[in-house]
């Protein structure tokens, strides 16, 4: 473990919830790949990683279980899903519209839906970043990728 190495080296989603649609699973795979490639993840009060993150749902709560690369316990943070419910619901609705649009809509229609989708995704990302304040310091791009994974878990659950 290198002191000050504040990044994720592995991210795992709760597999007990099951799989989702191919589109959602693709989003999950891309988000995890991008997250591992580039992220900023600093649990408050810890000397440094890299870290492994297990994201799960338990009793309608979002659970972030963090360990070091070699498995040493760092922290577990449990967040209420309530602040995310409306955002995730809106995000799923617009994603369904987006996936339908890419099959048959005009490029301008697809672009308009995609702009709305990105806006809602940004709102969810900022909400997640805010909810982790004082627990884990992350940058906005890391928050975006983590929010995608929260949505995947929510969709499965």
Swiss-Prot record:
Pfam families, A to Z: UPF0262 (PF06793)
Record family assignment: Belongs to the UPF0262 family.
Protein name listed in UniProt: UPF0262 protein RHECIAT_CH0000657
């Amino acid at each position: 473990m290198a002191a000050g190495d504040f990044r994720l080296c592995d991210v795992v989603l709760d597999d007990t919830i099951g799989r989702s649609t191919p589109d959602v699973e693709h989003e999950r795979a891309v988000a995890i790949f991008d997250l591992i490639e580039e992220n900023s993840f600093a649990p408050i009060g810890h000397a440094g990683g890299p870290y492994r993150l297990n994201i799960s749902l338990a009793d309608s709560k979002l659970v972030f279980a963090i360990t070091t690369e070699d498995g040493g316990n760092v922290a577990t943070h449990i967040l209420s899903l309530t602040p995310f419910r409306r955002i995730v619901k809106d995000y799923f609705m617009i994603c369904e519209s987006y996936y339908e649009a890419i099959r048959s809509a005009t490029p301008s229609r697809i672009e308009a839906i995609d702009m709305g989708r990105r806006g809602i995704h940004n709102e969810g990302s900022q909400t997640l970043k805010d909810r982790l304040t004082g627990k884990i310091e992350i940058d906005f791009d890391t928050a975006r990728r983590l929010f995608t994974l929260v949505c995947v878990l929510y969709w499965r659950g």
